[in-house]
Amino acid sequence: VAGTIAAVNDNGIGVAGIAGGGKGRKGVKIMTLQLFDGMNSCSLAMEARAMKYAADNGAVILQCSWGYNSSKANLIMGYTPGPATEEEWAATYPLEKEALDYFIYNAGSPNGVIDGGLAIFASGNEYARQSSFPAAYSKCISVAAIAADYTPASYSNYGSEVLLCAPGGDLEYYGTPGEDDDAYDENGTLKEQGAIFSTLVVNGVAGYGYYEGTSMACPHVSGVAALGLAYAKQQRRHFTWEE
């Protein structure tokens, strides 16, 4: 995710980030805030502290490749449905909504490039006809995933709450490395992949790999948003978060 946004370009290493800069061009700055502990658990209090810290310390884009299951998630597939409406989500997770609103209304500056913040979320991967929350919140930008041929990815949530789609990959096209024989040619060489190649933790070590999901689509939108704001700053333009 971070590599998709801000990996340095033109350095002969790894991948090129959408807003990574390179060869004398400045890239965007990333503020990394840990939400989940080592057991993959996150409390609402931890989440709220991170969002408030981001708003208070200069971040203007909230890149969130996480969320609950869609309320339309397939029970047969073992999914536990999440909130169905904005009202239900707000009533169930009031601290989360309050923290998001704080970021959206208090990030940025009236004198800067943007007054307020952009909250960008992955729509979810249950192939459901509704985006998951918090992505489905009307003040957030919900991002669905498309495959290499620009068609909807086989796993991506969709529906009226989704505002944008971006490359998220789809391993259904070529097979999963290490799992499917058709991912390799007759010489055992990895063939073309339908997933996103990015910086990735491999066996606990920083590396590179292929990954799919709306979580990979989301940073494409965040990266483009960062580029747009950087250009607007050069032009001395000003926007509100709604614009």
Where are these regions (language model features)?
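Short helix-coil transition/hinge motifs at the ends and kinks of transmembrane helices
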Residues: 24, 39, 76-87, 200-205, ...
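Catalytic-core segments of hydrolase enzymes
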Residues: 1, 60-192, 197-198
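Subtilisin-like serine protease catalytic core
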Residues: 1-46, 57-60, 67-72, 114-115, ...
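Aromatic- and histidine-enriched alpha-helix N-cap/loop-to-helix transition segments
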Residues: 42, 91, 95, 216-223
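Amphipathic, non-transmembrane alpha-helical secondary structure
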Residues: 45-56, 101
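Hydrolase catalytic cores
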Residues: 2-6, 31-36, 52, 60, ...
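Short, glycine/serine-rich, charged loops/turns that create anion-binding
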Residues: 9, 37, 124-126, 147, ...
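Alpha-helix N-cap/helix-initiation motif
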Residues: 43, 85, 89, 209-214
